[in-house]
Amino acid sequence: MASAQWLGLVLALLSSLAASGFPGSPFRLLGKRSLPEGAVNGIEIYSTKINCKVTSRFAHNVVTTRAVNRADTAKEVSFDVELPKTAFITNFTLTIDGVTYPGHVKEKEVAKKQYEKAVSQGKTAGLVKASGRKLEKFTVSVNVAAGSKVTFELTYEELLKRHKGKYEMYLKVQPKQLVKHFEIDAHIFEPQGISMLDAEASFITNDLLGSALTKSFSGKKGHVSFKPSLDQQRSCPTCTDSLLNGDFTITYDVNRESPANIQIVNGYFVHFFAPQGLPVVPKNVVFVIDVSGSMYGRKLEQTKDALLKILEDMREEDHLNFILFSSDVTTWKEHLVQATPENLQEARAFVKSIQDQGSTNLNDGLLRGISMLNTAREEHRVPERSTSIVIMLTDGDANSGESRPEKIQENVRNAIGGKFPLYNLGFGNNLNYNFLESLALENDGFARRIYEDSDANLQLHGFYEEVANPLLTSVEMEYPKNAILDLTQNSYQHFYDGSEIVVAGRLADEDMNSFKADVKGHGALNDLTFTEEVDLKETEAALKEREYIFGNYIERLWAYLTIEQLLEKRKNARGEEKENLTAQALDLSLKYHFVTPLTSMVVTKPEDNEDQTAIADKPGEEQAQAASQTSFSAYRTSYQPPLGSAASYQPPLGTPYYYVDGDPHFIIQVPEQDNAICFNIDEEPGTVLRLIQDPATGLTVNGQIIGDKKSSPDSATRKTYFGKLGIASAHMDLRIEVTTEKISLWNEVGRSTFSWLDTVTVTQDGLSMTINRKKNMVVSFGEGVTFVVILHQVWKNHPIHQDFLGFYVVDSHRMSAWTHGLLGQFFHPFDFKVSDVHPGSEPTKPDATMVVKNRQLTVTRGSQRDYRMDARAGTKVACWFVHNNGEGLIDGVHTDYIVPNLF
């Protein structure tokens, strides 16, 4: 079951100077305005309201902020809202001095063309990016003239999912200044009746919270209002800064007189199912744990802490075993064992003894665990009425044994055969999360990212609590034949205690008098059937009597749930099936105005008397990279101010770097000797060279050579450079093509194209790519692999020279020992000795003898330039130059590195 969804919301309004004033008469005296208390840089946020309407778990949220520019000059106002990753934005409007600029949801490719046109003019800002574990941030900024007012209004919707027996609305509040009218107003309507309602804040004492907070519930209605006065917002009695900086949480649950509840409005129905009081079904759990070398240290210790805590929660009727995989696969016991006190004590000793070693043979580890569960069932080693679960934890990609993701998926799918679920826990960012998610989804489970933080052990244990208490297995939701259309998922492997199954659909005949639903499942003691029958007229009339709820909420809930499930199915679909799923999800997204991974919201806003276009896309899990973010997204963009040269990527101190720039000059830093080696490669324009290839991580970098506009036929005087680079990840099914004009990114969702005129950050699971306008591009694959591409621009009308690229490897410590290529072969430690330094043919460039790789070479002292910090002049780097295309230094000869194309 999916975890409870936190309705997260951060309000952060930031103000900054956007213009330095207005031209006017030299005799005009400008008096300083008296600014209201709490105003920041002349911008007063005088009203912020979060209006939440929750109807039958479906939340409709409107965030409205009003600000005025009290300064004498134009100012830039930014509006930031953090919303749940599970939410869909449905509307955004910007109102300036009474003129409203709305947002429009369009197909992503249609919006992209509008976006790219604006990017080419250097005018755009992407609006949505990931923010932490559960949230993504919506940001928009606008210039506001002196004395003018601006209103921002954002609407988003989501289905709240039950987690550990309650629904949670989690609001992270951060206005960053005193706000005259600040209010959170939440209305909850639940036809089943509300059984409990609570609210608390992390940033304010209970005494102050009590006077600012009102909460009440009676019957079907609940209300929470948080309305602090200016004095209650102050961080101290005489302070002008706000203490509203933290978490505000609303929790509630509903009455459950029967296990199921059906609601019908306007021809759509929703069926909630959450039985209580059932005995727990015994479970058979195999923990498949990655103990490869990358788990060394804190990660492994936190994993062991979590496993010890999980062992405390095991019931005696449960069965368990541990599978450890690195280069090899080992097991704690030959077969599953019962969770008796004696066995649990032995299990604790085993967990404490776990140590890291070797590489990552994920395929064999999983297959061993699956085989063990199958054998236990076949040999009747576990109770007949029990359920099996595989829980796998890994922090990296498979790089030993079978490492092809598609083959691993096939092996696991065939081995499980739909008999039990697989849950995948991805530890950190240096892994292919999309693969783990696809692997889990097609085996009736789900994936969860475990963030590398101090609470990682709590995250692991928290996941286990979600699946610790299965009450039913093989759950089927059945409805009258020919009576329903467009049904969402109605078959589930498990129902877990404290969760809820939600099914929605459309009635084929709205004139029917009654509606009946059966839920069938296997319990701990027997097979169960729960029947719910409702009178359509009575049900619809009862729901419509509440005027304040939005009447089409069940239809929108159905659309939300359908889109969510179509997108999940799409991840493992291929060919025509994937096209059909995409078309269905896109049609619904456009019809119901949802910003999903297939659509974008385009906002046109006024800037300097011109319309500026901005685009909001749905990020993916991705995020997963701590900035990143939702696994559906083709790309994610976030606006950043133009970066100066000082903002270029700076590697950690002591990190060796390798690069190729200029004509093209290859420079290899050898930090152990505080020295560098360099060589040139002379080849015809159009030649593609292999720079990096790592079969373990799946990363490849190739570069294509270009010449001057007017090339010399004489190779001695010919100037060549890199004009195009291809960066690819086989494991992520991702390609990046960099030219001197644009950057193109392909992944499984499609193609995204950006301009060197843009300043933008693009993230998806395992990737972070930042383009700094007209300067450089920084590409990181998780933690430990970072490349920088430098753009060298010349006068476009120069008669000879043209723009070219430099390529720098500033972090390679996660690349494997099998990495090769003209640059990649030097990522591994190597040694050289220089002796017999003597005058060369040029007085300032002495020659010497170098012994490297058991070869003796004649080298010349020279210098090249590092352009990372200064793209124009560069920084001089002294190096020993190896002649003849690096002969004797590189493995083989340079022509061995010529490849047919970029990818």
Swiss-Prot record:
Glycan-bearing residues: N91, N580
Domain of life according to the entry: Eukaryota
Record PTM: Heavy chains are linked to bikunin via chondroitin 4-sulfate esterified to the alpha-carboxyl of the C-terminal aspartate after propeptide cleavage.
Biological processes, Gene Ontology terms: hyaluronan metabolic process
Post-translational modification Aspartate 1-(chondroitin 4-sulfate)-ester, affected residues: D663
Gene Ontology terms: cellular component: extracellular region
Main location: secreted
Annotated keywords: Glycoprotein, Protease inhibitor, Proteoglycan, Secreted, Serine protease inhibitor, Signal
Domain VIT: 29-158
Residues of the signal peptide: 1-20
Listed Pfam families: ITI_HC_C, VIT, VWA
Gene3D superfamilies: von Willebrand factor, type A domain (3.40.50.410)
Subcellular locations according to the entry: Secreted
PROSITE patterns linked to this entry: VIT, VWFA
Domain VWFA: 284-467
Keyword DNA-binding: no
Propeptide: 21-34, 664-903
GO MF entries: serine-type endopeptidase inhibitor activity
Family matches, as InterPro entries: ITI_HC_C, ITIH, VIT, VWF_A, vWFA_dom_sf
Cysteine-cysteine disulfides: none
Family to which the UniProt record says this protein belongs: Belongs to the ITIH family.
Role, per record: May act as a carrier of hyaluronan in serum or as a binding protein between hyaluronan and other matrix protein, including those on cell surfaces in tissues to regulate the localization, synthesis and degradation of hyaluronan which are essential to cells undergoing biological processes.
Subunit and partners: I-alpha-I plasma protease inhibitors are assembled from one or two heavy chains (HC) and one light chain, bikunin. Pre-alpha-inhibitor (P-alpha-I) is composed of ITIH3/HC3 and bikunin.
Record's protein name: Inter-alpha-trypsin inhibitor heavy chain H3
Organism: Oryctolagus cuniculus (Rabbit)
